[in-house]
């Protein structure tokens, strides 16, 4: 059975992700107590169910300590994938304000006796980060701070299409002026490269458009940086695998996240697709949903 566990911070899009999996034919359960999960998996497997998605959040805090052991146990018999959704505190506060929903931990008792009840939304968010932090290392993290619901649904569908027998690498382009991604394991700054933005004909385009590709592809310094990053990844990927890492997010940043970082993320993704499962995501580039988050398939490989 394939089991997808969705966890992370409240307001980061867990319900959207769960709904996307339900549309994809998964048997979905929201806020399941972790200790019930093995029994549910056995029951559904006996009943012929082959796909299960479960959302787990801080309301299950009493059982969260059990999750690492449960994930290891389930992985012996099932294809288990963990998706950890995150977002900046500012983005979460804005979402809760817009929806007028109450945070699950608002009004709960703080772990610090001197603080007492968690009176503010920001306190509740930070407390939840502490509670679910141990689960982040088991899952593929994605920062939804700037991600719209339809883009998240598309990304989740791409995520479950990947084979689960090897390290999954996500190349994520972004713009430093919009903040660094929270989900990055490795980050490379490509702002030292010539910027197509200063060519007025290229300014409205992205690193996916042929004129921008031609501009950057003609520069030896661009290929030098790509070669250096690729060499670094090829050297260290075996060590990430040996460390039992299932997911690795490689963030590529330029000023606006529209030209250089997009081109380099695409180029590196195509190269590395020979050696790992690869997803590419463009966080800040003005591209359509399918282009902003997609698998790198055989046809993309040089």
Swiss-Prot record:
One of its GO terms (molecular function) is GTP binding. InterPro entries: P-loop_NTPase, RapZ-like, RapZ-like_N, RapZ_C. Keywords: ATP-binding, GTP-binding, Nucleotide-binding. GTP binds at residues 57-60. Transmembrane segments: none annotated. ATP binds at residues 8-15. Displays ATPase and GTPase activities. Belongs to the RapZ-like family. This is Nucleotide-binding protein Bcen2424_2795.
């Amino acid at each position: 059975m394939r089991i997808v566990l969705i966890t992370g911070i409240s307001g980061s899009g867990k319900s959207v992700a769960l709904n996307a999996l339900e549309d994809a034919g998964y048997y979905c359960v929201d806020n399941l107590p972790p200790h019930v999960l093995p029994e549910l998996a056995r029951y559904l497997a006996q009943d012929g169910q082959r796909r299960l998605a479960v959302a787990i959040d801080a309301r299950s805090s009493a059982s969260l300590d059990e999750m690492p052991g449960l994930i290891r146990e389930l992985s012996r018999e099932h294809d288990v994938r963990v998706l950890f959704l995150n977002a900046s505190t500012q983005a979460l506060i804005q979402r809760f304000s817009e929806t007028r929903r109450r945070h699950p931990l608002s009004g709960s008792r703080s772990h610090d006796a001197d603080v007492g009840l968690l009176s503010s939304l920001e306190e509740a968010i930070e407390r939840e980060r502490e509670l679910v932090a141990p689960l982040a290392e088991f899952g593929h993290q994605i920062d939804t701070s700037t991600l719209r619901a339809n883009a998240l649904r598309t990304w989740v569908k791409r995520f479950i299409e990947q084979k689960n027998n090897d390290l999954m690498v996500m190349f994520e382009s972004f713009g430093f002026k919009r903040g660094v991604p929270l989900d990055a394991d490795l980050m490379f700054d490509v702002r030292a490269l010539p910027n197509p933005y200063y060519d007025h004909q290229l300014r409205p385009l992205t690193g996916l458009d042929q004129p921008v590709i031609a501009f950057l592809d003609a520069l030896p310094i661009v290929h030098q940086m790509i070669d250096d990053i690729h060499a670094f990844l090829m050297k260290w990927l075996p060590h990430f695998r040996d460390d039992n890492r299932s997911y690795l997010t490689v963030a590529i940043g330029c000023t606006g996240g529209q030209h250089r970082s997009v081109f380099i993320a695409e180029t590196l993704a195509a190269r590395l697709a020979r050696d790992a499962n690869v997803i590419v995501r463009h966080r800040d580039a003005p591209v359509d949903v399918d282009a902003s988050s997609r698998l790198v398939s055989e046809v993309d490989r040089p």
